[in-house]
Amino acid sequence: MISTDKYDLIFWDFDGVIKESVSVKTDAYVELFKPCGSDVCKQVKNHHLANGGMSRFDKIPLYLRWAGIEQDDAEVQNYCDKFSRIVKDKVIASAWVPGVQDFLQKYKEKFIFVLVSATPQSELEDICRSLKLTEVFCKIYGAPNSKTESIRTTMIDYKV
């Protein structure tokens, strides 16, 4: 294990770091694009797995283009909403990454924990409330905030 003695601030991602939820989202993308055929599903799955930290707001328009589906703002939002309905409860129910829950509870007073995720902000906050994590993190950043900008803002705010 890495020594934490020299750190005050720790950034956390969510999927695959706090909860074992990467496969939940992979399966949801495949389910969402299943009507478009196996070739599109395979392309979507491979892209998602290679670009895990990319927001669904960036992925879904790309996947719609691959599927040959008209992608106006309303259609993109429709697919994003469907995706959210598929994943939210499954993410909450997914297994914790081993040791993370205990670590977060044990060290929430010692460190500044900041959650930075590509999951939409309101959905991420709902998930964190359901998991009793809102008191663990000093700040929770979700999409449309980029991870890079969220980290930069935090480092400025905490003068790191």
Name each region found by the language model:
Residues K6, K88-L115, E125, E149-R152:
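Short, acidic loop-to-helix structural element flanking the phosphoryl-transfer center
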Residues L64-Q101, F111:
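Metal-dependent phosphoesterase signature
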Residues V114, P120-V160:
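Substrate-recognition "cap/lid" segment bordering the active-site pocket of phosphatases
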Residues C41-M54, P61, R65:
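N-terminal polybasic phosphate/anion-binding patch
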Residues T26, V30, G53-P61, C80, ...:
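An amphipathic alpha-helix signature
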Residues V24, S55, A95, G99, ...:
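Short beta->alpha linker loops
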